[in-house]
Structure formats: structure tokens, C-alpha cells
């Protein structure tokens, strides 16, 4: 499994192998710095995977230069270039038979940036639907009870406020990323159990809490 988010802790001890392919400060608008599709194909050639959990967007809130033209953020040209790059990236991930999940972006502290992220997420969700890729809308999971940004959010088990965000108002800390990926983690466990049964491999025994170990 490749992780583009920080959900690694959700799977420790569950019989999963985790390969972190993520690279900071990259995105679909930055192919002059790093071609994500090419990098993915190189990584997959060295390490095939069964599932990929990916999330992009925070670094792509900018214009994209392609084919001699500068396309403003969310313009038709931007959507065409980014859409084509997403197609190639997902195709590369699926080339090993991997299932792909896309996790949307959390709410941002800065209102203007948050509006841009919402517009981009709407584009990504529509694109993932066309590709048949499950899309997790993480925004509801990152709003407080008043529907606003808050660095502290209630723990899903205890209800007590827990620090989830870093000081920049953009990123999340480990427990915050795990909050976003719980639904995907559950789906991946079911997928892994089906795959193990079909291959004749034993399924890890369930713990008293019901989680596979």
C-alpha cells in the first residue's frame, strides 16, 4: 500500500506493508520540478502495490505553465492540464492492479485559501467520479461544532478536544491525518480480507475490539 497521506499509524500491526511514496512540496502544477506520473511509474517498478491512498491540492493553488501557456488557477486550461495529469497518475497507480483512493483537503484557516481549496476539491471529486476512484470528502471531519476552522477537534472516541492541526493553518498532525483516513482504513481492511480469502491466505484474527491484527 502506498500512502500519500499520513495514515500509516492506522495500519501498524495489521499485517500491512506500508510504502510512503509521498514527497513534500510537489503537485500537479509543478511538473517542471517533478513529474509525478513518471516518478510513480519508477517507484512502482521497484515496489508494486495493492492500494494507493492519495491527496493533492494544497501545493496546486496556483497557475500552471504548460505547452508555452500560463493557465490561471481553475481556468479551463488549468482544468485540462491538471485533469490530464491526474488521469496519467491514476493510470500509473492502477498499472499494478492497485485500488486507488483520493482524500479531499481539510478546511483551511485562511478564508481565501479555503475557498480555493473547496473549488479544487469539487474539481477533483468530479474527476475521481469519472475515473471510478472513491473520493473521501474530509472537510466535514475538520470543522468544529460551529462549522468553522479549529486547530482543536473532538476526539471521535472520547469527545475531548485534541490538537489536530499544525500552526500554519494548512497541515494536520499525525492524529489529525488518522482522523481523515479512518473510513479509508476500514475499507482497505475489508479489501485486504477479501483478497486474502481469495488467495487462500489466512486472515489476521480479530482482536476483542473487532479490529484485525
Spans of features found by a protein language model:
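Conserved SGNH/GDSL esterase-like catalytic core that processes O-acyl groups on lipids
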Residues: 1-81
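Stable alpha-helical elements in mature extracytoplasmic
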Residues: 3, 7, 32, 36, ...
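Structured segments of extracytoplasmic/periplasmic soluble domains
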Residues: 10-14, 42-47, 55, 89-99, ...
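Structural recognition of the beta-strand scaffold that forms the well-ordered cores
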Residues: 17-22, 50-56, 99-104, 134-137, ...
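Second-shell loop/turn segments in exported
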Residues: 25-30, 72-80, 89-90, 107-115, ...
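Active-site segments of SGNH/GDSL-like serine hydrolases
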Residues: 55-61, 65, 89-121, 140
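A short small-residue
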Residues: 66-70, 104, 161-165
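Catalytic His-Asp segment of secreted/periplasmic serine-dependent ester chemistry enzymes
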Residues: 107-213
Amino acid at each position: 500500500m502506498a500512502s500519500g497521506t499520513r495514515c500509516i499509524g492506522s495500519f501498524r500491526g495489521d499485517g500491512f506493508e506500508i510504502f510512503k511514496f509521498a514527497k513534500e512540496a510537489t503537485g500537479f502544477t509543478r511538473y517542471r520540478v517533478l513529474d509525478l506520473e513518471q516518478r510513480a511509474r519508477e517507484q512502482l517498478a521497484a515496489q508494486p502495490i495493492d492500494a494507493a491512498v492519495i491527496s493533492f491540492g494544497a501545493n496546486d493553488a496556483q497557475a500552471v505553465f504548460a505547452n508555452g501557456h500560463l493557465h490561471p488557477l481553475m481556468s479551463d486550461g488549468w482544468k485540462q492540464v491538471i485533469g490530464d495529469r491526474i488521469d496519467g497518475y491514476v493510470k500509473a497507480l492502477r498499472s499494478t492492479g492497485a485500488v486507488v483512493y483520493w482524500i479531499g483537503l481539510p478546511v483551511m484557516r485562511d478564508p481565501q485559501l479555503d475557498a480555493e481549496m473547496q473549488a479544487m476539491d469539487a474539481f477533483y471529486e468530479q474527476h475521481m467520479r469519472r475515473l471510478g476512484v472513491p473520493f473521501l470528502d474530509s472537510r466535514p471531519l475538520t470543522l468544529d461544532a460551529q462549522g468553522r476552522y479549529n486547530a482543536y477537534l473532538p476526539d471521535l472516541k472520547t469527545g475531548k478536544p485534541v490538537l489536530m492541526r499544525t500552526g500554519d493553518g494548512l497541515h494536520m498532525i499525525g492524529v489529525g491525518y488518522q482522523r481523515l483516513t479512518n473510513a479509508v482504513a476500514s475499507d482497505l481492511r475489508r479489501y485486504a480480507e477479501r483478497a486474502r480469502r481469495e488467495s487462500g491466505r489466512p486472515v489476521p484474527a480479530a482482536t476483542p475490539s473487532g479490529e484485525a491484527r
